[in-house]
A protein has these predicted regions:
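Secondary-structure boundary elements
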Residues: 218-274
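Low-complexity, Gly/Ser/Thr/Pro-rich intrinsically disordered linker/tail segments
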Residues: 81-87, 97, 127-143, 334-369
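C-terminal motif of bacterial Sec signal peptides marking the signal peptidase cleavage site
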Residues: 17-20
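Bacterial N-terminal signal peptides that target proteins for export
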Residues: 1-9
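Active-site nucleophilic cysteine motif
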Residues: 249, 256, 274-292
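Intrinsically disordered, low-complexity N-terminal segments that are enriched in acidic
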Residues: 23-209, 213
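Hydrophobic helical h-region of N-terminal Sec-dependent signal peptides
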Residues: 10-15
Length: 369
């Protein structure tokens, strides 16, 4: 009995102690961890941080090219007076840059100090639609300018712009390049457009944006129909020619001349020459270029003057040498001419086409080279 009483007392004491354990979880504890910088402090990885005026202008130009209407720039360890530089940079963007002259109406800003750095909220108002600004081409060389124009022709753009990092090119130079691109894309240009070029450079001249307008006389659907007809006509005309032979370029010239027997005085295209059968020197040269392209014969349309009058002709490769060939001056006999032979009556920009140094010669159908 005595042992049972002692066991009962011990059991009761144990139960009381276990009940007291619940109060342990009601106590407060201190948790420690390393200090972290607030997330709104500027870091070196933050791409919006601006440290000098040059960086500020780069950021503004980038945002304008992306058609950003409102954005925030953060100034970290800035070298200069932020308020003064912001005012100057916004004015320079609007009046002193090509992108500003092309499409920016106004630029405004507000600043706010945020802990360890300054933020500027920039607002840009544009005077052109977003689609025009975002589709500005960028070019560095004459070849890249031509590539941009060809892309615009292929897409049937009537208005487009090219940004060029140069101070030497003027509107007449760019218009000539656009014209050359049109002449040498006979499959695309089936209605020769009028060309208008406007330059935008602001008060600076390190960069220029050239706005180009092409005005056609037929609709987009008509252009597509003409391209299809011309493609079929070229395939028909070249089907009887054998590619790779020395005489093939000369035979191709006769094919073009026979397909276009009527001469007109208005500016024409390969479509006019090969589908309608009538063309001036422009149309004949473009038609020959179209046929040579189909046969993989190196050929180019040259724009120049003949006895003081605007004229187009071709420079074509025959047996490894280049020659001038003016189809508007030929009959059944072809006169392949050198640069020296042409200079007396023709004028052209020498570096616009390959050099023709080989001796001139006359070719008649059926002859072997």
């Amino acid at each position: 009995m005595h042992k049972r009483c002692i066991a009962g007392i011990l059991l009761a004491a144990l139960l009381v102690s276990l009940c007291g354990c619940t109060s342990v979880f009601d106590k407060e504890y201190l948790s420690e961890r390393p200090y972290e910088e607030p997330s709104n402090l500027l870091t070196d990885a933050d791409t919006t941080q601006i440290r000098n005026y040059a960086g500020l202008m780069r950021a503004l130009n980038t945002m304008a090219a992306q058609y950003e209407r409102s954005f925030v720039l953060a100034f970290g360890d800035y070298d200069g007076i932020i308020a003064d530089d912001l005012a100057a940079a916004c004015e320079e963007l609007r009046t002193g840059t090509a992108i500003g002259a092309y499409c920016i109406e106004s630029v405004s800003y507000e600043t706010e100090q945020v802990i360890a750095y300054c933020e500027a909220s920039i607002t840009i108002t544009y005077n052109r639609p977003e689609s025009e600004v975002r589709s500005i081409y960028s070019a560095q060389t004459q070849k890249s300018i031509l590539d941009c124009v060809v892309d615009a022709l292929d897409r049937q753009k009537t208005q487009f712009a090219i940004q060029i990092s140069t101070s030497t090119l003027e509107t007449d130079d760019v218009a000539a390049l656009v014209r050359s691109a049109c002449l040498n894309q006979p499959q695309l240009v089936v209605d020769f457009p009028s060309i208008d070029v406007t330059v935008y450079s602001g008060s600076g001249n390190s960069q220029k944006i050239f706005g180009i307008t092409l005005q056609y006389s037929v609709s987009e659907s008509a252009v597509n129909d003409r391209r299809t007809q011309l493609d079929g006509r070229v395939r028909t005309l070249t089907s009887a020619l054998t590619t790779g032979e020395q005489e093939t370029p000369l035979q191709a010239a006769l094919v073009v001349m026979r397909a276009c027997e009527q001469r007109i005085s208005t500016v024409s295209t390969a479509y006019d020459a090969l589908v309608n059968g009538s063309a001036d020197s422009y149309g004949l040269a473009m038609a020959y270029k179209a046929v040579c392209d189909a046969l993989n014969i190196p050929c180019q349309v040259v724009s120049g003057r003949f006895q003081g009058i605007d004229r187009c002709w071709n420079v074509v490769q025959i047996d490894g040498n280049y020659y001038h060939l003016d189809l508007s001056m030929q009959s059944e006999t072809l006169w392949l001419r050198s640069d020296e032979s042409m200079r007396g009556t023709y004028q052209w920009t020498a570096d616009s086409c390959p050099t023709c140094a080989a001796q001139s010669f006359i070719w008649r159908e059926g002859e072997k080279l």
